[in-house]
Amino acid sequence: MQYALLFPGQGSQCIGMGKSFHESHTLAKELFERASNALKVDMKKTLFEENELLKESAYTQPAIYLVSYIAYQLLNKQVNGGLKPVFALGHSLGEVSAVSLSGALNFEKALKLTHQRGKMMQEACLNKDASMMVVLGVSEESLLSLCQRTKNVWCANFNGGMQVVLAGIKDDLKALEPTLKEMGAKRVVFLEMSVASHCPFLEPMVFKFQELLEKSLKDKFHFEIISNATNEAYHNKAKAVELLSLQLTQPVRYQDCVKSNNDRVDVFFELGCGSVLKGLNKRLSNKPTISVGDNKGLDEAIEFLEEYV
């Protein structure tokens, strides 16, 4: 049986994520402690209690990475010889998680990199009142045309199933709501985001992030990664630096990535908080997706692997 690993991005976070892992597994407790030491913040409080910190990209991103890393390690322990996916695919931030878990970036460095990525995004969007908005029920072509006619709004994520995420100035996004309803939008939902990702607002941080990747990454990949920006497979440092930097200002083409690689695998494992990618995959793939964001999902994945691998 062939399988792929999926890693969620910003927007999948919620209070309590990773808690069942922390309560049941010594490894998870140790990783929470290491993460707290690396970031100099109590990650248990940040993830398990109501607080403002989890709304800041500088902490949201390492928090999401932490839960993905734990899910991967717990599942990896249960597989004879370790996980050997055909490929890994992350949604936005999740691509950084995928690169790390392929072996190119160790745990502490990845925590600091995701923290810096989120912080740079916040700085790039400072004083812009930026946000992101999900539009359901309007075609990609119609939204691309609308964005071309609209100042400070861009298509940021093509998630498939007539779901597109727009990024830009909050007031400009809000002003589009009546037009979107006229165009047939079933739902328009603002995301809990303090930044506008995958758009020109992030151009000021591209070079700095590229430098950070050059310093942090190793040229060591155990499995290939699918690029969000170009839908190409890569497994070396040079390409990772190029494509993770490019991704900042280019839309996430999740739909294309799943559809063009669907026939290569029999099942997808979503590693990390929530089941956002499982939901998207229902519209994109005829293959099952198992979400490993808590102990129940972990048990389901282990049972599946024991039966078929």
Give, region by region, the residue ranges found by the protein language model:
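Structured loop/turn residues at beta-strand edges in well-structured enzyme cores
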Residues: 1, 83, 183, 221, ...
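FabD-like malonyl-/acyl-CoA
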Residues: 1-142, 187, 191, 267-296, ...
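NAD(P)-dependent dehydrogenase/reductase Rossmann-like domain
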Residues: 212, 217, 259, 263, ...
